[in-house]
């Protein structure tokens, strides 16, 4: 009987602690703007493409951030951002060395993450993890191509918008995680203002290429994003 009473008292104390902590949280909602730079590389099989080399390129990342604090150390965060995910392909087969293509892909990204925070009242660290959905809005390419005669190889520059076709998977999804740092530079009774720095890694789990009729050719984009933000909590 005494053990049951002790268990009951422990549960009551735990519940009271959570309620008391929540009651002391003045600002549950956080809204903000963010912007920065990212680097994207493509994960693709080299089967049948031994003369192709892929390398990452940079792109812009800017958008909105919304967060709801469940406790002092846990929040649910959702971002809505426009992101350019770019990479480069080079041909390295002797006389084709000058040939290359830059791929620039504009995406709308919607990550949903758990935000685990730690630290003091003003300076706090954040560990983020979750998933995201994305929509491929536009695709652009530029580079140098070639054409041949019996005796010569000619090179031409090209640049333009690429039209989507049935092989493109425009809706994609994946896992996202990273670290963040925030500093509250203004604290008022009804509002806090803070600046933030986030490093997030987006890992595609859905190929943006559906493949051909008799050939599977999955292509996944992986992006490291660094952004600065301005946040308002209320």
Regions inferred by a protein language model and the residue ranges of each:
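Hydrophobic core residues within well-ordered beta-strands of beta-rich domains
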Residues: 29, 60, 74, 108, ...
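Bacterial Sec-dependent N-terminal signal peptides
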Residues: 1-29, 34, 228-234
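Short loop/turn motifs that connect adjacent beta-strands in outer-membrane beta-barrel proteins
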Residues: 23-28, 73, 119-124, 185-193
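Short glycine/proline- and aromatic-enriched beta-strand/turn motifs that initiate or cap beta-hairpins
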Residues: 23-65
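Helix-adjacent hinge/juxtasegments
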Residues: 101-107, 114-117, 123
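Extracellular/periplasm-exposed beta-strand and loop segments of Gram-negative cell-envelope proteins
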Residues: 41-57, 84-107, 134-172, 204-225
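Residues on the lipid-exposed face of transmembrane beta-strands in outer-membrane beta-barrel proteins
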Residues: 33-37, 60-68, 80-82, 110-116, ...
């Amino acid at each position: 009987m005494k053990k049951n009473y002790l268990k009951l008292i422990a549960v009551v104390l735990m519940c009271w602690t959570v309620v008391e902590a929540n009651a002391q949280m003045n600002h549950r909602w956080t809204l903000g703007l963010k912007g920065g730079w990212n680097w994207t590389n493509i994960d693709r099989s080299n089967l049948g493409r031994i003369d192709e080399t892929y390398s990452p390129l940079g792109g812009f990342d800017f958008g909105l951030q919304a967060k709801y604090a469940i406790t002092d150390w846990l929040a649910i965060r959702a971002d809505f951002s426009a992101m350019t995910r770019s990479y480069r392909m080079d041909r390295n087969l002797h006389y084709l060395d000058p040939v290359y293509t830059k791929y620039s892909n504009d995406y709308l990204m919607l990550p949903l993450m758990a935000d685990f925070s730690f630290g003091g009242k003003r300076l706090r660290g954040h560990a983020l993890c979750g998933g995201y959905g994305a929509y491929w809005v536009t695709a652009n390419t530029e580079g140098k191509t070639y054409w041949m005669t019996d005796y010569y190889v000619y090179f031409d520059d090209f640049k333009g918008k690429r039209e989507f076709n049935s092989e493109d998977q425009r809706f994609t999804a994946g896992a996202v995680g990273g670290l963040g740092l925030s500093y509250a530079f203004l604290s008022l009774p009804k509002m806090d203002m803070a600046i933030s720095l986030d490093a997030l890694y987006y890992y595609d789990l859905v190929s943006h290429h559906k493949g051909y009729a008799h050939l599977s050719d999955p292509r996944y984009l992986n992006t490291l994003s660094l952004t600065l933000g301005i946040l308002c909590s209320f």
